[in-house]
A protein has these predicted regions:
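Short acidic, S/G/P-rich loop/turn micro-motifs used as interaction or catalytic elements
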Residues: 21-26, 52-55
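Alpha-helix termini
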Residues: 5-10, 77-80
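Short, charged, amphipathic alpha-helix that recurs within catalytic cores of restriction-modification
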Residues: 25-47, 65-77
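Domain-level recognition of nuclease-like catalytic cores that cleave nucleotide substrates
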Residues: 49-139
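Intrinsic disorder/low-structure terminal segments
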Residues: 3, 18, 44, 108, ...
Length: 139
C-alpha cells in the first residue's frame, strides 16, 4: 500500500506500507523488507499475529519473526537510500492485545542484533522490552 500527497495537482508518494500475518516464510518477509529499504520514502511494516509464545520472535532454529527481520534487514542494508528515511516496525498480537513498535533508521544497522534480540532469543511479545521497542496494551 502507498500513501500519496497531492502537491500542485501532482501526487507524490510519501509512505510505503507492507502487511504480513502469522509467522510467514522468511522469503515473504524478505521481499517486503527489500521493497521498503530500497524505496526513497519512509515505510511501515505491520505484522499481525493471532498469538505469541516462547518461540514466536526468536529461537535457536532461527524461525522467529525477529530472526527473519534481522536476516532481511542485514541482507538489504546496503540498499538503504537516505540517512533521514525511517521504517516503522509494528507487530500486533490479537489474543494478547499487545502492540509493539519501533522506528528503524540507517544508523540502527550498527546494532542490528540488539534491535532484534538475536543473542537473547526473546520469544513471546511480553518479553520484548528495550532496544528502542515500545509496547502498547489494548483493552
Amino acid at each position: 500500500m502507498c500513501i500519496f500527497e497531492r502537491i500542485n495537482n501532482e501526487y507524490q508518494r510519501i509512505l510505503n506500507i507492507e502487511f504480513k500475518n502469522k509467522n510467514t516464510k522468511r522469503e515473504s518477509i524478505e521481499k517486503d523488507i527489500q521493497k521498503l529499504v530500497s524505496e526513497k520514502v519512509d515505510g511501515v511494516f505491520i505484522h499481525l499475529l493471532e498469538n505469541t509464545n516462547q518461540r514466536t520472535f526468536s529461537n535457536e532454529r532461527e524461525t522467529g519473526i525477529f530472526d527473519k527481520l534481522y536476516k532481511s534487514f542485514f541482507d538489504f542494508q546496503t540498499k538503504w537510500n537516505d540517512e533521514h528515511k525511517s521504517i516503522r516496525l509494528i507487530i500486533i498480537s490479537l489474543k494478547q492485545k499487545i502492540l509493539i513498535y519501533r522506528v528503524l533508521k540507517k544508523n540502527d544497522f550498527e546494532n542490528l542484533k540488539d534491535v532484534f534480540f538475536i543473542e537473547n532469543h526473546c520469544g513471546s511479545i511480553e518479553e520484548i522490552k528495550g532496544n528502542g521497542w515500545e509496547t502498547q496494551t489494548t483493552k
